[in-house]
Amino acid sequence: MQLEKMITEGSNAASAEIDRVSTLEMCRIINDEDKTVPLAVERVLPDIAAAIDVIHTQVSGGGRLIYLGAGTSGRLGILDASECPPTYGVKPGLVVGLIAGGEYAIQHAVEGAEDSREGGVNDLKNIGLTAQDVVVGIAASGRTPYVIAGLEYARQLGCRTVGISCNPGSAVSTTAEFAITPVVGAEVVTGSSRMKAGTAQKLVLNMLSTGLMIKSGKVFGNLMVDVVATNEKLHVRQVNIVKNATGCSAEQAEAALVACERNCKTAIVMVLKNLDAAEAKKRLDQHGGFIRQVLDKE
């Protein structure tokens, strides 16, 4: 796909004279364009749901969720991956973010990195990619060689693959097994895909990882019941989670958390089923860590 024909490279009539308006009007123009992004994501919800189901199947079987991108797309993948361990208590290697140019590229532009097909393949090889893993290639344009080559390599290994881009029919979309293509239109600043396209990608990644965690039993109701208390704020959140899930007092919640080494799931089962920590943990283990199953089946 030629660059000049890409939707993400088009000129936006709404912002054609944005350099001549007041600061407030400038903000209104950007905000009006941003409002269109959730609607673009809404149109591809069935594609997102299909990807979540595949990711959950693979991860449940021992695989990993791997994000692969360059520039803004790569940084968004790293952001999403890095939030999964503290939020959901998963091991750091379960959700992985890879960026063209490596760690240095998280804060700096690395010239030519996104054009390296070899880089995309080597980065996946370096993390020991297996057929059980799912590779999600992220590229607003859908033409990034680093991402395309990585997806091709992943498919050769037998991995399930997902391509996220904002240009219909792009190479990323056609290379991946599952395509997620929120079409957000031309950017306020022509070609600045960190804006609407980046926002759309962030919304999609939020759904992919959150959907995976919900289906994996990491959420009870709407509570993050595997949250790791790494600071005072999260200690308080743990108490509130146990309170909200059980209706007990803050003192009861704290006592249960202390008794089970601050595991919200165990504390919730302890309170609701009137069990000690060891028995509550045993029952959770018997039901794969799903609180709902412990409560419904016993």
From Swiss-Prot:
One of its GO terms (molecular function) is ether hydrolase activity. One of its GO terms (biological process) is peptidoglycan turnover. Its EC number is 4.2.1.126. It catalyses: N-acetyl-D-muramate 6-phosphate + H2O = N-acetyl-D-glucosamine 6-phosphate + (R)-lactate. The keyword Lyase applies. Induction: Induced by MurNAc 6-phosphate that releases the repressor MurR from the DNA. Repressed by MurR in the absence of MurNAc 6-phosphate. Pathway: Amino-sugar metabolism; 1,6-anhydro-N-acetylmuramate degradation; Amino-sugar metabolism; N-acetylmuramate degradation; Cell wall biogenesis; peptidoglycan recycling. NCBIfam families: N-acetylmuramic acid 6-phosphate etherase, PRK05441.1, PRK12570.1. This is N-acetylmuramic acid 6-phosphate etherase. It comes from Escherichia coli O127:H6 (strain E2348/69 / EPEC). The gene is murQ.
